[in-house]
From Swiss-Prot:
Residues 31-49, 115-157 are extracellular. The lineage of its organism: Eukaryota, Metazoa, Chordata, Craniata, Vertebrata. It is a multi-pass membrane protein. It comes from Bos taurus (Bovine). Keywords: Membrane, Transmembrane, Transmembrane helix. The keyword Mitochondrion does not apply. It is found in: Membrane. This is Transmembrane 4 L6 family member 18.
Length: 201
């Protein structure tokens, strides 16, 4: 019962993380609060991978919903025996937790690549990835950020939002990993009740 409540709490935690991922990813389309750059395709290419909207967002909401349904006591009726049903639900829970790791892991990797690449911005040489060859060194040297003339404050915008996406998807990976460990321990160890009969001791 305790592990089931813990699993439900972890599944519920995925919902706000997914919603925030969607919001943060959407904000990446509006650097400096302007929509003109998205309509003219002047955004970093990693924004178009929909890592926060689709994978760490909508897909994780689906995963969370399925996991919450699987944690419901009323679902242990798919087989003829309760023990069979519990094993079946445990396997399904592990599969969807693994899918959650894959979806959030995708967002984590793409967001990290977007952070290291830097924004697509207008410099003195025109529109380009001004920091693409710096291997992320620009992240710790704010003096280089002045190379981006437009959109205004796009470097800070990208760094903050991609960092938040990395944190959110990282938390999702951790939550799903914990769920896998819980389900593995349940399936390998099982839950046994010890009945001591009078007169044996």
């Amino acid at each position: 019962m305790g592990s089931r409540k813990c699993g439900s709490c972890l599944s519920s935690l995925l919902i706000p993380l997914a919603l925030w991922s969607i919001i943060v990813n959407i904000l990446l389309y509006f650097p400096n609060g302007q929509a003109s750059y998205a309509s003219s395709n002047k955004l970093t290419n990693y924004v178009w991978y929909f890592e926060g909207i689709c994978f760490s967002g909508i897909m994780m909401l689906v995963v969370a919903a399925v996991l919450l349904v699987l944690e419901n006591d009323n679902n242990y009726k798919c087989c003829q025996s309760e023990n069979c049903s519990k094993k079946y639900m445990t396997v399904l829970s592990m599969i969807f937790s693994a899918l959650g790791i894959a979806f959030s892991g995708y967002c984590l990797v793409i967001s990290a690549l977007g952070l290291l690449q830097g924004p697509y911005c207008r410099t003195l040489d025109g529109w380009e990835y001004a920091f693409e060859g710096t291997a992320g060194r620009f992240l710790t040297d704010s003096r280089e950020w002045i190379q981006c003339l437009e959109p205004a404050h796009v470097v800070e915008w990208n760094i903050i939002l991609f960092s938040i996406l990395i944190a959110l998807s990282g938390l999702q990976v951790i939550v799903c990993l914990i769920r896998v460990v819980i389900q593995l321990s349940k399936s390998l160890c099982g839950t046994y009740s010890v009945i001591i009969q009078p007169g044996i001791i």
